[in-house]
Amino acid sequence: MLTSAADPDGIAAWIGHDAPEVAVLSVGQSIDLYKDVGAPADIAERYGFKHLRGSHLVGHTRMATESAVTPAHAHPFTAGRDFCLVHNGSLSNPHLVRKKLEPLGITFETDNDTEAACRFFEWRLREGDDLKTAVTRGFSELDGFYTFLMGTDRELLIVRDAFACKPAVVAETDDYVAIASEFRSLAHLPDISQAALFEPKPEEIYSWRI
């Protein structure tokens, strides 16, 4: 992690030009991003996750089906400052999305379909959309099956595609909101028996302000 008072975008551009062998995972002031290959428990120990403190966390374990098993291809992906996205599913038109966005100055780093979605949202946020508007535009642009979970410095958001093929469950209490693909990932949480549980509806955007 590099900490500097300089403009984050300027630092990222400098690294890309003068040290292209260095991968920039994320830039910003609020969100730290970690990616690696291995068992979740080993990665958590390697980076000292138990010592981290914050208001919200987005995590993802990935079974690669169409792209390489490398940290660069792992989730979360980022779009601009303090934004992260994880994805359960598969997009059928990532190459068309890429073909549309590259002439607009959007840079891609992998062939991962999740990055195509992330770069689409990056473009829309750059054009002035708020996150909900960007996601709504994605309904007509991103083709495939997906559940997207996104985090910013101020917001947590989940959305599923029109068919809602990929599972998701939300638990809400007075103290926390927890989201997972399956309930068994939430079953150990405190007071989970008192939580309001629901599955997000197709193409309905759910968000929580931090």
Where are the language model's segments positioned?
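N-terminal segments that mediate ammonia production and transfer
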Residues: 1-210
